[in-house]
Amino acid sequence: MEQLANQLRQDLQIRFTDPVSIHQILRSKNIIAYFRPLEGLSGMAIKVSRLEKDTSYLFMLVNTAEGYCKQRFTACHELYHLLCQKDFNVSYDKVNLFDSTNAEERNANIFASYLLMPTMGIRQLIPADQQRKDSIKLGTIMMLEQNFRCSHNSMLIQLHDIGLISQTYMDAMKGNVKNMAREYGYSTELYEATNKTELVGDYNLKARELFDQNLISQAKYFSYLRDMDIYKDTQNAKEESNIG
């Protein structure tokens, strides 16, 4: 999973010390993505194969009623399903309930972690005197998560998984993340919901192409538009670089 995530960064020329650009990936991979507030669902991915060509239509839905950092993780999670998973069709990920019993869901989480927080980038940003296990300071952890635009808990887990902190040390570093951010002079926006609506790509056009090529029924075509509120939102949805 780490190699796949690193390769995607390299293909798009994103440095390991930089935050990954979700929008850059969406555009380069021709993924139609819709960001909007949802209830009970963190994200969804749909892949529809074209019959006459070795290509697919790729769709993603992300819940903006969750924290900005969670939105980025969800998007990266769905990227695994769309770009890496074999024989993939559809995935629904409920709020706070990624299916840990499913091997591909675990793979998606691991892929998302390395895409957001690459080992090489983390190690390059940590001061030399904090490279030993359990020596990293809270201020450095806060700097890392702000830099990579990820959640506090995700960063702690990643630091643990790459051997920089123990479980005991990780537990000691947990707390009210917004208070910790303020203490170190950071904005709390990373951890807050954006509740924005944004459409990346021409979803309406792609859905119509699927219908015209008999890849989906008329009922499914209108269901896609209705479920994602295309009629109501496409007139107003402007690209706001919601999740970077």
Model-derived regions: residue spans:
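Active-site hotspot residues in diverse enzymes, especially metal/ion-binding acidic/histidine motifs
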Residues: 1-244
